[in-house]
């Protein structure tokens, strides 16, 4: 999970709501905590109450891809992570009222959740993704196509 947007991390109530939802998930939550998020968690003294959520230092891009690919589900407010989860076939719950990547919402591969404990839990526990998925971002073979084009001189 990632939570870093100011609208989700600048008020104690929202951070507390998100963390309490995480604590009720069936699977453990790994939370690479952005400095702003970490500061708020410390300010509201929540970390000592976390049993299901492990706060870790921010991680690199490749590590995040690894975690995303191997996650049961991703919960995030990140714009980019929604798209990466879609490409990696990992269901995503986005903690926002809207998304730049509206195509990821098709087939429930990504769903939007309000900053409300019940809504977050409902979306995490009850969203079923469609078996069908559009290849909006390609088939992952762009590098192969580029190399073939360069080699062929076309």
Where are these regions (language model features)?
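Nucleotide-activated sugar donor-binding and catalytic core shared by glycosyltransferases
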Residues: 1-25, 31, 37-154
């Amino acid at each position: 999970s990632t939570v870093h947007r100011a609208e989700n991390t600048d008020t104690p109530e929202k951070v507390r709501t998100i963390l309490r939802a995480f604590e009720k998930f069936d699977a453990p939550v790994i939370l690479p905590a952005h400095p702003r998020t970490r500061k708020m968690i410390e300010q509201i003294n929540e970390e000592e109450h976390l049993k299901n959520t492990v706060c870790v230092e921010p991680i690199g891009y490749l590590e995040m891809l690894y975690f995303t690919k191997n996650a049961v589900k991703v919960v995030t407010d990140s714009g980019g992570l929604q798209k990466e989860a879609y490409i990696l076939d990992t269901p995503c719950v986005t903690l926002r009222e809207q998304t730049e990547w509206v195509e990821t919402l098709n087939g429930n591969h990504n769903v939007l959740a309000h900053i409300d404990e019940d809504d977050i839990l409902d979306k995490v526990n009850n969203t079923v993704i469609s078996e069908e998925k559009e290849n909006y971002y390609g088939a992952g073979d762009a590098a192969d196509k580029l190399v073939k084009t360069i080699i062929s001189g076309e």
